[in-house]
Amino acid sequence: MASSMLSSAAVVTSPAQATMVAPFTGLKSSAAFPVTRKANNDITSIASNGGRVSCMKVWPPVGKKKFETLSYLPDLTEVELGKEVDYLLRNKWIPCVEFELEHGFVYREHGSTPGYYDGRYWTMWKLPLFGCTDSAQVLKEVQECKTEYPNAFIRIIGFDNNRQVQCISFIAYKPPSFTGA
């Protein structure tokens, strides 16, 4: 009796087995993987601008303080700052202006390990510019901060309120008294 029940159950499950996916059979052959080529150290093969390679000299690596994003470039003009803020706004990030009166760069005064008091946290200028749609509004706030604190470092940061992270940060103004050393 038990054998007849077992065979009828096997008959019922056989149509379901016909629709199952084939089992995993292992990795594909190595013929499907690309063959590695000999490394070509010729710099002209890397650039594809018609054979003309134009390299831009970057900021000197020794004796210059590094700040935020783009710190290896010369100071940004008002037009370039506006373009960076437009990029920030296009990505739906919330702009915020911050300033620092003493040290506009990371420094370690109270130890050799990174910590809270090593120059990463600046004072916020007003509130973040929620709902801002124009880079001129942000640059106006930078100008007001410059007027109020002419000897301060000023940076613009962008927050992504969905991911709850700071996505961009760059220096908008360095005080005239700063020598860069």
UniProtKB/Swiss-Prot annotation:
Localization: Plastid, Chloroplast
Targeting signal (transit peptide) range: 1-54
Disulfide bonds: none
Entry GO terms, CC: chloroplast
Protein keywords: Calvin cycle, Carbon dioxide fixation, Chloroplast, Photorespiration, Photosynthesis, Plastid, Transit peptide
Major localization class: plastid
InterPro entries the record matches: RuBisCO_ssu, RuBisCO_ssu_dom, RuBisCO_ssu_N, RuBisCO_ssu_sf
Signal peptide bounds: none
Any GO BP: photorespiration
GO molecular function: ribulose-bisphosphate carboxylase activity
Entries under Gene3D superfamilies matching the protein: Ribulose bisphosphate carboxylase, small subunit (3.30.190.10)
Biological role: RuBisCO catalyzes two reactions: the carboxylation of D-ribulose 1,5-bisphosphate, the primary event in carbon dioxide fixation, as well as the oxidative fragmentation of the pentose substrate. Both reactions occur simultaneously and in competition at the same active site. Although the small subunit is not catalytic it is essential for maximal activity.
PANTHER family: RIBULOSE BISPHOSPHATE CARBOXYLASE SMALL CHAIN 1, CHLOROPLASTIC (PTHR31262), RIBULOSE BISPHOSPHATE CARBOXYLASE SMALL SUBUNIT 1A, CHLOROPLASTIC-RELATED (PTHR31262:SF10)
Subunit structure: Heterohexadecamer of 8 large and 8 small subunits.
Protein family according to the UniProt entry: Belongs to the RuBisCO small chain family.
Extra information: The basic functional RuBisCO is composed of a large chain homodimer in a 'head-to-tail' conformation. In form I RuBisCO this homodimer is arranged in a barrel-like tetramer with the small subunits forming a tetrameric 'cap' on each end of the 'barrel'.
Protein name: Ribulose bisphosphate carboxylase small subunit, chloroplastic 2
Protein source organism: Brassica napus (Rape)
